[in-house]
UniProtKB/Swiss-Prot annotation:
It comes from the Bacteria. The keyword S-adenosyl-L-methionine does not apply. Homotrimer; associates with NifD. This is Nitrogenase-stabilizing/protective protein NifW. The gene is nifW. It comes from Rhodopseudomonas palustris (strain HaA2).
């Protein structure tokens, strides 16, 4: 194996960590879209940026990027971001309910028993 091949193989083994590292250092949702070369409508991102990134994280949790070449790891991350973005193009953050506060807003509330204090307890 030549030094170039060894260097390339070593770079590929670090590739998933590299793209993930770049995404972790991104300072805005727009940077995610730019890093992964995903086209987006600024109006959608302005309304749902945190929701899109949270959903992307949920989708990425199901992906195994370990050991993938850089190009494939980047392509998978791109596909995941496109999928998360598409969720919010087709519907609203309220419809998707990514965050707990939105899930709890529509969760059925358990009926509470009426408060009862016996007269004996008042003595």
């Amino acid at each position: 194996m030549s030094a170039t091949q060894a260097s390339s193989q070593q770079a590929d083994s670090k590739a998933p960590a590299d793209i993930i590292g770049q995404l972790q250092r991104a300072a805005s949702a727009e940077e995610f879209f730019q890093l992964l070369d995903v086209a987006y409508d600024p109006n959608v991102v302005n309304v749902a940026r945190l929701h899109i990134l949270k959903r992307m994280g949920q989708y990425l949790a199901g992906e195994d990027l370990a050991g993938l070449p850089a190009a494939e790891a980047t392509a998978r991350c791109k596909a995941v971001l496109e999928r998360a973005y598409a969720d919010f193009v087709a519907s609203t953050p309220l419809d998707q309910r990514v965050f707990k506060v939105l899930k709890d807003a529509v969760a059925p509330k358990s009926p509470r028993a009426p408060a009862f204090v016996s007269l004996d307890a008042l003595k």
